[in-house]
Amino acid sequence: YGLVGSEMCIRDRPLSERIAYAPFEKLVVSAEEAAQHVNHGDRVGISGFTGAGYPKGLPTAIAEKAKALHEKGEEFKIDVFSGASTAPDCDGVLAEAEAIRFRSPYNSDPTLRKQFNDGTALYQDIHLSHSGQQVEEGFYGDFQVAIIEAVRITEEGHVVPSSAVGNNLEFIEAADKIIIEIN
């Protein structure tokens, strides 16, 4: 559905070397543009397993969108699913923007933990090995967006995931829209 090329990727190698599949060239957008496809109430599956393999740029863009909408008095909260914990530039920025309504299966961010404890965000603590199966079996309903980190898209269109795959396959199969962040 969309490709996000982060600044990290651009400094390392030209984005054209990372996205070698010609039909995808026209799909490249900024993180801010991609964030416009994530809406209030969406169920969002993100790649990653611990502090690796999660999207780096898009969570900040989604957090900025949430802050702007909150300043206008509009609601913006999403349900976030991953393979495990992420890091401050994912869970942390979304929590600080009060953009998370529900989080599963794991959290290690102190701001988000406070929100769970004060009831402003919901949390489901399940065994990590069950989370993908529950998504696959439809326990949570439809997913609107999957945000997957990758290091490259080959000439044949194969997506090369980064260092932590987590529940990528389950999120891709469950989501209406897929955003691939190239890092």
Question: Where does each model-flagged region fall?
Answer:
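Gly/Ser/Thr-rich beta-alpha loop segments that engage phosphate groups in nucleotides
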Residues: 4, 50, 159
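Single conserved hydrophobic/aromatic residue that forms the stacking wall/gate
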Residues: 1-5, 9-10
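Internal alpha/beta core interface subdomains
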Residues: 113-183
